[in-house]
A protein has these predicted regions:
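Conserved anion-binding
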Residues: 2-3, 13-26, 93-174
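N-terminal beta-alpha supersecondary unit
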Residues: 18-60
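Short, acidic/polar
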Residues: 28-41, 85-91, 148-159
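A structural motif
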Residues: 45-46, 74, 97, 165
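Glycine-rich, proline-tolerant flexible connector loops at the mouths of alpha/beta enzymes
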Residues: 46-65, 102-105, 169-174
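Alpha-helix-loop-beta-strand connector modules within alpha/beta enzyme cores
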Residues: 58-80, 114-132
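Catalytic cores of alpha/beta
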Residues: 64, 72-100
Length: 174
């Protein structure tokens, strides 16, 4: 069986700068947001993921950036930006995003949010991002920035899917 290759860059953004990251710490500037988008647009990326990793989130500023990006570029877009309310999810989707990314840490605060969003936009529009690490034979998932709790990753993925996630993004931080 031949599997179709897809190019899906995952861009970590703070303001108008794209970074590569390692273990939650920005460590290398990749470039200015729009020049990086131009590059992936011309190299025919199949989809682009944008995650706002700034510590002080400015949702309205980020939302404006998403609107500019969706007007200029025509590839599918997944957006992650600390979406913690139904209203924020609606705004991101109405700005032109094809999918939204929810951090699995959101379940600690409001585990019903994913099912509410899924009922409106469909599970195909919901990605849940799980940051995890393995230490001494145990599995841990992130519940916020650098705070991890011990939890079985497979069970957590099942929980996310049962509550409306259409896709799971696993990020190893080991």
């Amino acid at each position: 069986m031949k599997i179709k290759k897809r190019i899906i860059p995952n861009l970590k953004v703070i303001d108008d700068v794209v970074y590569t990251t390692k273990q939650f710490m920005p460590h290398r500037v990749t470039g200015e947001t729009y020049s990086v988008f131009d590059y992936f647009y011309h190299t025919q990326a199949d989809e682009v993921v944008i995650c706002d990793i700034s510590e002080k989130k400015n949702f309205s500023k980020f939302l404006s950036k998403v609107k500019r990006i969706t007007k200029k570029y025509s590839f599918p877009l997944s957006i992650g930006c600390s979406i913690d309310t139904l209203d924020k999810a609606k705004q991101i989707m109405n700005a032109g995003s094809d999918k939204i990314i929810l951090s699995s840490g959101i379940f600690k605060k409001n585990y019903k949010l994913i099912s509410k969003i899924s009922k409106i936009f469909g599970s195909q529009s919901i990605q849940v991002s799980i940051d995890y690490k393995r230490l001494n034979g145990c599995e841990y998932i992130s519940c916020s920035n650098n705070n991890f709790i011990q939890k079985n990753i497979t069970e957590h993925m099942k929980f996310c899917i049962e509550n409306g996630a259409g896709e799971i993004i696993l990020n190893s931080v080991n």
